[in-house]
Amino acid sequence: MTDGPLIVQSDKTLLLEVDHPRAGACRAAIAPFAELERAPEHVHTYRLTPLGLWNARAAGHDAEQVVDTLLEFSRYSVPHALLVDVAETMARYGRLQLVKDEEHGLVLRSLDPAVLEEVLRSRKSAPLLGTRIAPDAVLVHPSERGNLKQVLLKLGWPAEDLAGYVDGEAHAIDLAEDGWALRPYQSEAVDNFWNGGSGVVVLPCGAGKTLVGAAAMAKARATTLILVTNTVSARQWRDELLKRTSLTEDEIGEYSGARKEIRPVTIATYQVVTTKRKGVYPHLELFDARDWGLILYDEVHLLPAPIFRMTADLQARRRLGLTATLVREDGREGDVFSLIGPKRYDAPWKDIEAQGYIAPADCVEVRVTLPDAERLAYATAEDDEKYRLCSTSLSKSRVVEKLVAQHAGEPTLVIGQYIDQLDDLAARLDAPVIKGETTVKERQRLFDAFRHGEITTLVVSKVANFSIDLPEAKVAIQVSGSFGSRQEEAQRLGRVLRPKGDHGSARFYTVVSRDTKDQDYAAHRQRFLAEQGYAYRIVDADDIDGGVPDADGVLPG
């Protein structure tokens, strides 16, 4: 027995003692391969999963490193069977390889003939395979490249795709490094992606994912299709590319609800690409409109299901996914792995914070007690109404008013899910509100006013969760969300993580109704951030009148 912070159990769960002096080092060491499941105050539970281990393998970690990490931090002896299982699971990645054969074209090759035999006999994979040309090789039709990778992953034999990519139509793109340069982690992310061919780069919000995309484009020097979440995001990508690269306005097209421009660099929204008319996708032609050399997926954790199907046909093109979290609430992380590619780079948020590239954050959960009348209404409500009732309690509005007053003059975002609640808060705070029906032009006007300090408080619905660059937001107050969405929590914290001019820290408040579904969902949402090393302090709404001190005891204002 040693004094390690980790207990490794035979059911593949890892228990991390949060208050242990080496907990931070342990968390950083296990993050590349373990998945956080629960994060209460004192002991966090992680799990080893095949997908987590394969992602780690693809990102350059081997079984020996994983085993050494578990042995180094474990308090008790690690079950031998678990160590063997880790080694065997990681060895499954790459046992099958998709390669380009000069004579036969696309071929599935196996380093282990018995594995190939198993795959050939499987009812799921056999129809996707062609003629066996050698004891260790079988033909694959290029159109089945994506589907085959999905099926092989489900069979437990994730294929390493070494078949290469078409170069696409050449188009000169250079970074315009005029008074700025890529940060070291951005350069490393681009190199890892390029060497791997395709895959996902995971970086915190505010850490410059767009620049990683721009640098990848400069490396590819080819026509590029960029898929983004919404029109505002598309225009921000366009502005950033004009500022950071040699591209001109004529070379960048927007393919959205408003415009249908196809140019050497085309930025399209997920919504338009997945629009269906009479059972067909009329905008599918966009993927064949040019000989794209690179396809970029922004916020890859939000990729709609139809785009997975479209991406299965794009396996011969380089694909780069950008995201702050690989967590998908629909559980389709395996499809991201198979079709976009494995994780190529993942920077822990706290590491980038330590380098000064994102602001430190103080996360506070403010718990309110429902008044008797609301409590009774909640107790007697139908299950599907309960979350809305406790999320929109009037007690929350009073807490938000106090918090905004305490941070008067500081750029503050109030974020929520329910429009009537946000309209009420906007009226109470005398602040503008941005919601789904707000026009793109009006959104941009309000975002610009917020950036320039003309507005200090802005009330926003979930439309502001993604890709909205609000560099000056210093305080975020969350009143309601998409049930227990961890990805949403990460995005919302990201709104305030961009580095502050005064090197100060950001405040992230979550206002939660005590002893309700709201509290349960809040605990679930916080799991991802706990994995990144963010601790939530819990304060009572009755105790905030004099202000909520930060972790060092300093009051706001």
Curated annotation (Swiss-Prot):
Residues 1-135 are annotated as: Required for protein stability or solubility. Its EC number is 5.6.2.4. Pfam families: ERCC3_RAD25_C, Helicase_C_3, ResIII. SMART domains: DEXDc, HELICc. ATP binds at residues 203-210. Keywords: ATP-binding, DNA-binding, Helicase, Hydrolase, Isomerase, Magnesium, Manganese, Nucleotide-binding. Monomer. This is DNA 3'-5' helicase XPB. The lineage of its organism: Bacteria, Bacillati, Actinomycetota, Actinomycetes, Kineosporiales.
